Amino acid sequence: MSTLINGTSLGNLLIVTGSFILLLLLVKKFAWSQLAAIFKAREEKIAKDIDDAENSRQNAQVLENKRQVELNQAKDEAAQIIDNAKETGKAQESKIITEAHEEAGRLKDKANQDIATSKAEALSSVKADVADLSVLLAEKIMAKNLDKTAQGDLIDSYLDKLGDA
């Protein structure tokens, strides 16, 4: 009985081994090329995806660098615009101050001329009034033949009138 078991086991082993080898030969003949093609296609797809991802990363890096350069240029341009505006403002400030000083000088000169004209007119008017009063005083003195005290009082009276005028 033990030879039967050993013989059966050996027979089973030979049948299973033969079946396995036959299966491998059939798979190699009919399916191996298709399986290899599937694995090759999968490998190529994964490699392509990795390359695409690397290219996308590089493009993103280039784009980021370009955006950073543009941002820096925009900042520099904004700073330049601000500096130009400050310079323009200072120039306008200086111009306005200069014009204001010139206008103040013109107004001062005109006021001085007006004052001089008014003074000249006032002096002319006073001279005319003094001349008229002097003539009037002389006429009264001649007409009245006054003593020295009366003449002094009369002159003081006319001078007071002149001071009021």
Curated annotation (Swiss-Prot):
GO MF annotations, alphabetized: proton-transporting ATP synthase activity, rotational mechanism; proton-transporting ATPase activity, rotational mechanism
Keyword Membrane annotated: yes
Compartments, as annotated in UniProt: Cell membrane
InterPro entries linked: ATP_synth_B-like_membr_sf (IPR028987), ATP_synth_b/b'su_bac/chlpt (IPR002146), ATP_synth_F0_bsu_bac (IPR005864), ATP_synthase_B_chain (IPR050059)
TM region positions: 7-27
GO cellular component: plasma membrane; proton-transporting ATP synthase complex
Keywords for this protein: ATP synthesis, Cell membrane, CF(0), Hydrogen ion transport, Ion transport, Membrane, Transmembrane, Transmembrane helix, Transport
Membrane topology value: Single-pass membrane protein
Self-association and partners: F-type ATPases have 2 components, F(1) - the catalytic core - and F(0) - the membrane proton channel. F(1) has five subunits: alpha(3), beta(3), gamma(1), delta(1), epsilon(1). F(0) has three main subunits: a(1), b(2) and c(10-14). The alpha and beta chains form an alternating ring which encloses part of the gamma chain. F(1) is attached to F(0) by a central stalk formed by the gamma and epsilon chains, while a peripheral stalk is formed by the delta and b chains.
Function: F(1)F(0) ATP synthase produces ATP from ADP in the presence of a proton or sodium gradient. F-type ATPases consist of two structural domains, F(1) containing the extramembraneous catalytic core and F(0) containing the membrane proton channel, linked together by a central stalk and a peripheral stalk. During catalysis, ATP synthesis in the catalytic domain of F(1) is coupled via a rotary mechanism of the central stalk subunits to proton translocation.
Family: Belongs to the ATPase B chain family.
Protein name as it appears in the record: ATP synthase subunit b
Annotated organism of origin: Streptococcus mutans serotype c (strain ATCC 700610 / UA159)
